Amino acid sequence: MSARRQELQDRAIVKIAAHLPDLIVYGDFSPERPSVKCFDGVLMFVDISGFTAMTEKFSTAMYMDRGAEQLVEILNYYISAIVEKVLIFGGDILKFAGDALLALWKVERKQLKNIITVVIKCSLEIHGLFEAKEVEEGLDIRVKIGLAAGHITMLVFGDETRNYFLVIGQAVDDVRLAQNMAQMNDVILSPNCWQLCDRSMIEIERIPDQRAVKVSFLKPPPTFNFDEFFAKCMAFMDYYPSGDHKNFLRLACMLESDPELELSLQKYVMEIILKQIDDKQLRGYLSELRPVTIVFVNLMFKEQDKAEVIGSAIQAACVHITSVLKVFRGQINKVFMFDKGCSFLCVFGFPGEKAPDEITHALESAVDIFDFCSQVHKIRTVSIGVASGIVFCGIVGHTVRHEYTVIGQKVNIAARMMMYYPGIVTCDSVTYDGSNLPAYFFKELPKKVMKGVADPGPVYQCLGLNEKVMFGMAYLICNRYEGYPLLGRVREIDYFMSTMKDFLMTNCSRVLMYEGLPGYGKSQVLMEIEYLASQHENHRAVAIALTKISFHQNFYTIQILMANVLGLDTCKHYKERQTNLQNRVKTLLDDKYHCLLNDIFHVQFPVSREMSRMSKIRKQKQLEALFMKILEQTVREERIIFIIDEAQFVDVASWAFIEKLIRSMPIFIVMSLCPFPETPCAAANAIMKNRNTTYITLGTMQPQEIRDKVCVDLSVSSIPRELDSYLVEGSCGIPYYCEELLKNLDHHRILIFQQAEAEEKTNVTWNNLFKYSVKPTEDMYLYTSIAAGQKEACYLTSGVRLKNLSPPASLKEISLVQLDSMSLSHQMLVRCAAIIGLTFTTELLFEILPCWNMKMMIKALATLVESNVFDCFRSSKDLQLALKQNVTTFEVHYRSLSLKSKEGLAYSEEEQLREMEGEVIECRILRFCRPIMQKTAYELWLKDQKKVLHLKCARFLEESAHRCNHCRNRDFIPYHHFIADIRLNTLDMDTVKKMVKSHGFKTEDEVIFSKSEIPRKFKFPENISITETREKILHFFDNVIIKMRTSQDDVIPLESCHCEELLQIVILPLAQHFVALEENNKALYYFLELASAYLILGDNYNAYMYLGEGERLLKSLTNEDSWSQTFEYATFYSLKGEICFNMGQMVLAKKMLRKALKLLNRMFPCNLLSLTFQMHIEKNRLSHFMNQHTQEGSLPGKKLAQLFLQSSCFSLLWKIYSLNFFFHYKYYGRLAAIMQMNTSLETQNNFQIIKAFLDFSLYRHLAGYEGVWFKYEILVMEQLLNLPLKGEAFEIMAYAADALGHIKFLTGHLDLAIELGSRAHKMWSLLRNPNKYHMVLCRLSKPLFLKSRYKHLVQVLGWLWDLSVTEEHIFSKAFFYFVCLDIMLYSGFIYRTFEECLEFIHHNEDNRILKFQSGLLLGLYSCIAVWYARLQEWDNFYKFSNRAKTLVTRRTPTVLYYEGISRYMEGQVLHLQKQIEEQAENAQDSGVELLKALETLVAQNTTGPVFYPRLYHLMAYVCILMGDGHSCDFFLNTALELSETQGNLLEKCWLSMSKEWWYSAPELTGDQWLQTVLSLPSWDKIVSGNVTLQDVQKNKFLMRVNILDNPF
């Protein structure tokens, strides 16, 4: 039975019939229009309250998940219940009108009495439904019902394509009046209905002063059987389902295919409904919350009661309305009788019908309809209401009977304006503002209280759209504000200044044309140009703005320009204009021709006989000749600059005149225009190709300029980074988009304004760890709150998720216009792409497109790329590069382009498309040009459809959701996939085996990483010397490099690591698809993977953000006892701890890591007693592991995941404890280091064991071990020597070489650090892992720098620079500039100039990787501060020193941090010298504090001996400044001894010079360093031999000691 029903429902005729009443489906009408049919019946009018409020609530919802679908579900939940009741009781739903419906029981007159009883019963049951139904969404849904009975006339009208029907007559008027009298839950009978009904069955209540009555209840006699009574009544209903069909609600559900009937019924249904029925792809396509323009037309007739009379009038009006709407893609949605009149509900902007300038078109149509209908003889009054905004457009009703309708406050406002302001065309303020028409087309009307509309806002009368010359009104619309800068348009103004200069010098005409899309700020540019032009003496700037209407007015542009030139714009009366004109033209034009000017300037010169005989063309020529003479005369007296905004609306005659004008005399014309909608006229083309025309295509604003604009618009000193990213991405650099997004945020009260918090005073918690504000450029401070001395900042309301916000209606409309202009197949492609996300790959798009082949898709994509819907990129690096820079302004040379096309060099459109197809095939990554388009297209899908597509995407992506092939397809969190069952695709055994083989995945009882399966063969001799050890280790690494270079196996990866790209195009989208599918555990898995991956890549901010996403999901999980969830919690805290560690928040980090270990069943002791006990246990375990020769069976994946995570936590814990000075903390640190080793040994994984041994070696060296080689380093080498030279072993060896080199650098064995670092560099360069390779280069550069091996250093810096450019690696570039600053400050030559380094810092200090990377930015700021301190430029010093100070508190035990802090301390020491010299009060205290701080750094376990010489050098300088010669001598000698031991030639040379300087204490002039700086040689001079390295060494800064007498 259900299959049969499905088959019936799928028939086109059944689907069409569902949109129509039985009255039409089974009607037999004559073909003539209008046709009239009369019958008797009972009418029910049901009005449902609450839906309009609900529509308003949903249409203003912030988030994208509160859309049309929820609305349609709730609407139909209620309406379908009413429809079902009506159908069960034999009614026929005639019309749905928004949230009301009209039903008919058509019977013979003698049956009316009984049928009224049935209808009353039906009405009471409808009320009963709403008492029983639960109230949803906080809505109070109630119904009011009116009933009427009697004669009814049906009118059918229309044209050859569309038919409409109306029911008219007294009964129709009565039913509406009855419903209007009803209160909530009332049933009102009209007077005639009360007359005709069976009064004995009905208990009523009288209504004062009315003949209508209110039904209380039915009171049948005791013996009355309603079922029998109902069956008898239904026997008289023609189309009530009975017999075999009694289970059907409607007979029309059973219609057999009938092409003739189908064709006839199609005429009653809107075209977009028929499209949806034909195209099954578009199911649910029409239910939307959509910005539209409503035009409500009401016609009142002279003889209301005569069907024949009003029929012909309605027919005439309908035909005209249809023809007008067709031109502008508007549609009639409903026609019904409304308060004694006939109303047409017309809509512009239905799905698929959105067009540009919709509001203007709607007003044009309204005026046209008004003018026509007012002339129809039988129509007494025409009233039209126009309103714009978001309404619900969708199919409302029941499966078997529904209609496409619009519901919303804007529909109500249009209807109310139409009724309360009769006889005119009215519009609301949104329509008025959005029409872009001059204000003089409108007149504001007095406010009226309108039923059902709380506050409609201002109401305007549209006076007509014929352009009237209102002198003085055509100036540029917007005003220039003195206190507001023109942002991001420096280049555009430069074009003007340059062209202006040419104009003044050559005395030739110049035309400057700015083309840009709407919203690019063209008017703002012209306002600035008008201001600049008027600053010059003897210049006259005439500025006008045109509108769409101007184009249709012949010679309008010249008319307005000439009115301004002649000074008529300031005249208040036509007589004044006439006098002015007479004075100006009397010498140029005979008096008898003055009347030529009557029409054009609205004056009243007497009309001469000669003029009356003159033809129209001759008059125009005379007029043009006169204007030329006037302009020639004016040009002699002053320079004229014509400025025309919206020049695409210049009429053809005006273009022709302008073209002649620029050939005839020197004049400067500046225009702004949107791209021409159609091919411009010949004259416009000629101007564009003129050699004196400069044609500029406006670009967008750059990200920093958008940031500045937002800060200036909001008048704040800073905005949150999240807001900055949202606006930069969402606006795409278009000023209007940025403004609309900001307005939307303000409307939803998302922005909070309060005094900016001082960074150093903020108490750090996890939630504000990355409270990251971005600031405008310094030259913008003048326009923000900073200028007033108040640092007001903008913040976001807590809990808001900007990326999920629904786009503002204004921007949504722009996207809908573009979408609706596409073919249906292209729309489908865009909508499918929107599901994938902002960025997508061609492979995934192809996977989810229904029934497409690759050729079709490539062709469609090429077209969409060509039309700027998508951008395409070859790699994610290209994408990231493009996102940093928006499209800039450029010049178009139309003249040279036209010459090329004449030579046949221009491509045809087909060739261009073919070229684009080739480009799309090469580019696998695409991205929406406008994020708003993606959001808009995404919102068009229904929830179920979204789920299906998200599921498809997830299934496709999860196959690649791991590390890249280069990294052996592993998890970012080791063994993570063993813990959680996150796969959607079920795998058979063959697939599993293939995966094991190709990807390295193994079963749960096996592991991914290599094992220590081979027993140890090699051991170092016990008494081997340090030199022999060194030689053996270096020889081993040399052999490994040779093996890597010469191996025939797949030792060297064919491609470099591209994990970062996978994060963007696979793992992040996959996590988001799972969020959309509400698969929270799977989404959490991938967000944790993302956080871990970004930590590996050094991006703490992104790791924090994705961990935040994960935290939201963790809170939603319910299965708290499961091991997988416990592990996810542990991972979450472990990653939190790592982020806190990287940010220098050690207390928070320790807390998080302890939590993670507790969840992993490895409690870390929290008191000395448990510490002692645990230490004993761990030492025994270590001894057991170290003496264990044979390996037991492999561990399960789940166990390994747990051990790896524990090891990671311990690795961070010992570093945290090492930072603390409390003596017992070193025991905690030692325990953590031993526990890391034990955990790693338990994994039986070589890589993990080697990492732990090297970590423990580092711990011991930093804790004070003084030997060159620690025993665990020897154990590492033994492990390495026993590894087979293949696969992952090379990675382990490269890692070991790098780590050993790093340890040797920290401990001051610089030669050894260089030897090991060089070998690590060679290995990592072969292994093609940029993330590891850059770190090796950074580490290698420092010992080379200290050893003064500049040739090798410069070579390493060259590699580092190449890597930073090819990989777009910001960390490498920042480190490169850090070393360049070091070279200038300490080595005495220039590799890159100070200005270049400073510019890099200015451009990148807000980069999220640098800003949240502990140490590097501190080092850069401190180097700049030291530079300025040496030059005694103290203001600049304070600026950078204060920036560095905020980063000092992020104490992390890393080389970069200590590099940074040592330079920061040098800056403070130089400042102390200034304080002492100026005899500042607190100089002595500052000196003592500084010395303590330096001593603390030296005493710290984690600092590393390599930094001691510099720190002792600074301590010596502080002592000499404070007069403590003895201590100075001690620190100086200690530093020299350490430099000698370590081979630190750089520091040794500087120390020797300082010692010599301080001992001899000669006079030193303040500007000596300035002289040194000015003579610093470049590296090229050194290489060429012009400068020797011995000379370079003398370019050291000598710290001034002329404050005290020589203490020595």
From Swiss-Prot:
- Where Mg(2+) 1 is bound, by residue? D47, D99
Q: Which UniProt keywords apply?
A: ATP-binding, cAMP biosynthesis, Cell membrane, Cell projection, Cytoplasm, Cytoskeleton, Lyase, Magnesium, Membrane, Metal-binding, Mitochondrion, Nucleotide-binding, Nucleus, Repeat
The principal location of this protein is membrane
Q: GO molecular function of the protein, one example?
A: adenylate cyclase activity
Cofactor(s) recorded for this entry are: Mg(2+); Mn(2+)
Q: Which domain of life, per UniProt?
A: Eukaryota
Coiled-coil regions listed: none
Query: What does the entry list as the binding residues for hydrogencarbonate?
Result: K95, V167, R176, M337
Q: Subcellular location, in the record's words? A: Cell membrane; Cytoplasm, Cytoskeleton; Cytoplasm, Perinuclear region; Nucleus
Q: What is this protein called?
A: Adenylate cyclase type 10
Lineage, please? Eukaryota, Metazoa, Chordata, Craniata, Vertebrata
